[in-house]
Swiss-Prot record:
Residues 146-194 form the TM2 domain. The chain crosses the membrane at residues 144-164, 182-202. It is found in: Membrane. InterPro entries: TM2, TM2D1-3-like. Glycans are attached at residues 37, 91. It comes from Rattus norvegicus. Residues 1-22 form the signal peptide. Keywords: Glycoprotein, Membrane, Signal, Transmembrane, Transmembrane helix. Residues 165-181 are cytoplasmic. This is TM2 domain-containing protein 2. Residues 23-143, 203-213 are extracellular. Coiled coil: none annotated. It is a multi-pass membrane protein.
Amino acid sequence: MVLGGCPVSYLLLCGQAALLLGNLLLLHCVSRSHSFNATAELDLTPSGAAHLEGPAASSWEYSDPNSPVILCSYLPDEFVDCDAPVDHVGNATAYQELGYGCLKFGGQAYSDVEHTAVQCRALEGIECASPRTFLRKNKPCIKYTGHYFITTLLYSFFLGCFGVDRFCLGHTGTAVGKLLTLGGLGIWWFVDLILLITGGLMPSDGSNWCTVY
């Protein structure tokens, strides 16, 4: 069949070729658009913060104080994980080399307790400006090792003549002496009760009493 001097089959073939060419051009434009959008998403991070690649994908490089992304060191305590204070066991040289840590633990009054910086890190999934690991200052040099004041006081009152209270607190040497003398014939037993109540007798490892809520 001839239409306007051209076979119909030839016209259909030309139409299919034009349609195929149009589809190819459309696919090419769509792929270029997706590539541009992906690049734009990497560039358009929050103002003043550049996203870091690699395992710390939730870290940002801090560059603008007006940015909505804050430094990891400004996060509240519930969003960070901190190590326990470093115990230098009275080694002043090690303390000076490291720059932080505790020479001694514990204390009855606030003024008696040392304060130091500890290593902290932002929790996984929390977005903040790097570095994600930082020092957080003014942490008290206090540790808890399972000693309860009420329990120790009861031990001292009922079994103090046998040195159970001092055994419990880790004062093994004096506990043996207290046991052999049956609490110093009652005098040592009474003195230890007073020392416990006034805070003069504490765990030997420098830990504080555990708090009961």
